[in-house]
Amino acid sequence: MSRSPRKTPKSPSLQLGQAVEWPATPDAARLDRVPNPQAGTDYLVRFTAPEFTSLCPVTGQPDFAHLVIDYAPGAWLVESKSLKLYLASFRNHGGFHEDCTVSIGKRIAAEIKPKWLRIGGYWYPRGGIPIDVFWQTGKLPKGMWVPDQGVAPYRGRG
């Protein structure tokens, strides 16, 4: 017997299900959160953004990264459409690789207060040097399984 899908009513406070303009800047972007229906269970959520872009704050040239965001949720989850819009807001933002990566991790952590969060920013080379940036909050919950982020050391990533 098939089960009918749960219907969640549209919420005017969420961007999900709404026509939304792309935010002009990361500060203007809104990150939405939704209640975690499995709040009593330790588990891992992974977001992968293999085509993240920002701008060099000095030259204005585009910078490209493969971001991997892992977190152990508490009471809240990041709503994925709002995360997509937030990450896209960096497209015209001038920021060094380190600042972009750490700012994203801190912003998500501040919004949802996870039990644990880490971000890996694997930046493609500019001037022949790839830059990888890693940041995390606190300690991983005991017994939590966290797979490798799966981004190979630079040899022409892809």
From Swiss-Prot:
HAMAP family: QueF_type1. It catalyses: 7-aminomethyl-7-carbaguanine + 2 NADP(+) = 7-cyano-7-deazaguanine + 2 NADPH + 3 H(+). It comes from the Bacteria. Keywords: Cytoplasm, NADP, Oxidoreductase, Queuosine biosynthesis. Catalyzes the NADPH-dependent reduction of 7-cyano-7-deazaguanine (preQ0) to 7-aminomethyl-7-deazaguanine (preQ1). The lineage of its organism: Bacteria, Pseudomonadati, Pseudomonadota, Alphaproteobacteria, Hyphomicrobiales. One of its GO terms (cellular component) is cytoplasm. It comes from Rhodopseudomonas palustris (strain BisB5). This is NADPH-dependent 7-cyano-7-deazaguanine reductase.
